[in-house]
Curated annotation (Swiss-Prot):
Chitin-binding type R&R domain mapped to chain residues: 64-134
Function: Component of the cuticle of migratory locust which contains more than 100 different structural proteins.
Protein name (database record): Cuticle protein 18.6, isoform B
Entry's free-text remark on domains: The tetrapeptide (A-A-P-[AV]) repeats found throughout the protein are also present in many proteins constituting the protective envelope of other species.
Entry GO CC: extracellular matrix; extracellular space
Alphabetic keyword roster: Cuticle, Repeat
Sequence repeats: 21-24, 33-36, 41-44, 133-136, 139-142, 150-153
Amino acid sequence: GYLGAPAVVAPGAPLAARGYAAPAYAAPLARYAAPVARAYAAPVARAYAPAVAATPAAVEYDPHPQYSFAYNVQDAHTGDSKTQHESRDGDVVQGSYSLAEPDGSIRTVDYTADPVNGFNAVVHKEAGAHPAAAPVAVAAPVAHAPVAVAAPVRAYAAPLARAAYAAPIARAAYGPALAYGGAYH
């Protein structure tokens, strides 16, 4: 049965006769369930092909490179005039370029480059076909007479007068109180 229920006392019994039962506790259950056997699937074996190493394409190497190029621009509309030519034989580069300067002179640069001497350039300048323009005489600056400016006058106007209005008169009306609805019974 239920343990620890309060004791029942007959009505009218003196207070000293009343009492309470000592608390009692049920014994713990000592039953344990057997472990459940669990089954797991074996890991899936996966087969992959070995990675194929990409072989780089063979880069052609020229132990004795050679090239030669040249260009020429003569534009009468814009006045652009320039030329260049260059050649390479192994590790030695030789070339030249020229251009027309704004004053009409021709600047020519002859250059060489090799592993022993590095880069070397020689600059030649030929006089132009037309002489440089003479400087234009500039007129002397004109001195302007100072202009007198009067200081501003500060003037303040009086504030505008506003019309005053009296507050509206509130009239109180006294009378019997209004009754709402009928009496409740």
